[in-house]
């Protein structure tokens, strides 16, 4: 497997820290050791997050093409678009962001605080669109790229989650390689890695990266899309493409992709009572903030799996914290009392 042949533009601080979650582990009975790998602390660019790791492999391609405008898409409170806006500002490029109405949540300030506020502060051209949530290529995004061309610019397309981009899975192949190096320092291997999945390239990259040492099916995706079959198809397709890119040396098969579908409801972007409990529990025991859209759902999944005995006693479980806390202010009605 050869990731090094792909150019990478440094946007992160380096390897992200692995933090033991001692109080949460003890609260859940102490039979399973929980750790978090803090992708939410990976960069000085507008709080970073998992998309910043992915963008390190897209930026060289954008620069090689002579692009002057990064064009991306997400929901109103998209973490992806905030990270793209930050990278554009860092590079001195223009940025156009399509923000669709992906979440059926009404709050007077929902489109004025959190991620979208930060994107505007960084100079992005933010375009609100009424279209609802789905996975895949969106017409509104294609129209935004055409508008840049019509104005004489040269757009560089960055799809939702970087996931439909041919290089979108590479960053999290690197995540797996990074974890292996950290395991050598720690003196043990993780038995499971828990990660939130929606558009698929984060888990897909991990599946490929951990397939190199036989742990592909130990990557436990927690679906947050509430459209799990679409998400599963994307993860599998992206993983197969990425495996070919890096020369994994074996095919990705269906059993490599593990996606737990119990925690995505009630729908994309709306938290269940279990998700809200997980968000508050993690915050109050560890001072670690998770959000109602993504990380709260994957945290809910991990906590529930520990409680249900789905991790063997003595297991060491690594929670991939992908970011998302900047969206919390958009849900102030839910968290007004903490």
UniProtKB/Swiss-Prot annotation:
UniProt xrefs under CDD domains: ACCD (cd06449)
Disulfide bond entries: none
UniProt key word Hydrolase: yes
InterPro entries: ACCD_DCysDesulf, ACP_carboxylate_deaminase, ACP_carboxylate_deaminase_bac, TrpB-like_PALP, TrpB-like_PALP_sf
Cofactor dependence: pyridoxal 5'-phosphate
Stated family: Belongs to the ACC deaminase/D-cysteine desulfhydrase family.
Catalytic activity: 1-aminocyclopropane-1-carboxylate + H2O = 2-oxobutanoate + NH4(+)
Keyword Hydrolase: yes
N6-(pyridoxal phosphate)lysine sites (modified residues): 51
Organism: Burkholderia cenocepacia (strain ATCC BAA-245 / DSM 16553 / LMG 16656 / NCTC 13227 / J2315 / CF5610)
GO biological process, one term: amine catabolic process
Active-site residues, Swiss-Prot/TrEMBL: 78 (nucleophile)
Subunit architecture: Homotrimer.
PANTHER family: 1-AMINOCYCLOPROPANE-1-CARBOXYLATE DEAMINASE-RELATED
Descriptive protein name: 1-aminocyclopropane-1-carboxylate deaminase
Protein EC: 3.5.99.7
Function: Catalyzes a cyclopropane ring-opening reaction, the irreversible conversion of 1-aminocyclopropane-1-carboxylate (ACC) to ammonia and alpha-ketobutyrate. Allows growth on ACC as a nitrogen source.
GO-annotated molecular function: 1-aminocyclopropane-1-carboxylate deaminase activity; D-cysteine desulfhydrase activity; pyridoxal phosphate binding
Keywords from the UniProt entry: Hydrolase, Pyridoxal phosphate
């Amino acid at each position: 497997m050869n990731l090094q042949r792909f150019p990478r533009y440094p946007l992160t601080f380096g390897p992200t820290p692995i933090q033991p979650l001692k109080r949460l582990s003890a609260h859940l009975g102490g039979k399973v050791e929980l750790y978090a790998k803090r992708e939410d602390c990976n960069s000085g660019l507008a709080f970073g997050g998992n998309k910043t790791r992915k963008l390190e492999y897209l930026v060289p391609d954008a620069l090689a093409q002579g692009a002057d405008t990064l064009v991306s898409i997400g929901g109103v409170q998209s973490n992806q678009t905030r990270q793209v806006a930050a990278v554009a500002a860092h590079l001195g490029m223009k940025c156009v962001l399509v923000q669709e109405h992906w979440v059926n949540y009404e709050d007077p300030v929902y489109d004025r605080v959190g991620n979208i506020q930060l994107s505007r502060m960084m100079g992005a051209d933010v375009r609100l669109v009424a279209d609802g949530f789905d996975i895949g290529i969106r017409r509104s995004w294609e129209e935004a790229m055409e508008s840049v061309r019509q104005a004489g610019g040269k757009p560089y397309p960055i799809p939702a989650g970087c996931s439909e981009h041919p290089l979108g899975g590479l960053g999290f192949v690197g995540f797996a390689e990074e974890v292996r190096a950290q395991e050598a320092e720690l003196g043990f291997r993780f038995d499971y890695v828990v990660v939130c999945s929606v558009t698929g390239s984060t888990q897909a990259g991990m599946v490929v990266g951990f397939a190199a040492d036989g742990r592909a099916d130990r990557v436990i995706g927690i679906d947050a899309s509430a459209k799990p079959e679409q998400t599963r198809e994307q993860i599998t397709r992206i993983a197969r493409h990425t495996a070919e890119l890096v020369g994994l040396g074996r095919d990705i098969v269906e059993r490599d992709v593990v996606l737990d579908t119990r925690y995505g409801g009630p729908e994309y972007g709306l938290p269940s009572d279990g998700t809200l409990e997980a968000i508050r529990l993690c915050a109050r025991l560890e001072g670690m903030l998770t959000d109602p859209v993504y990380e709260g759902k994957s945290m809910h999944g991990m906590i529930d799996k520990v409680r249900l005995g789905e991790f063997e006693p003595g297991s060491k479980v690594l929670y991939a914290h992908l970011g998302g806390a900047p969206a919390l202010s958009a849900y102030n009605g839910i968290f007004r009392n903490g």
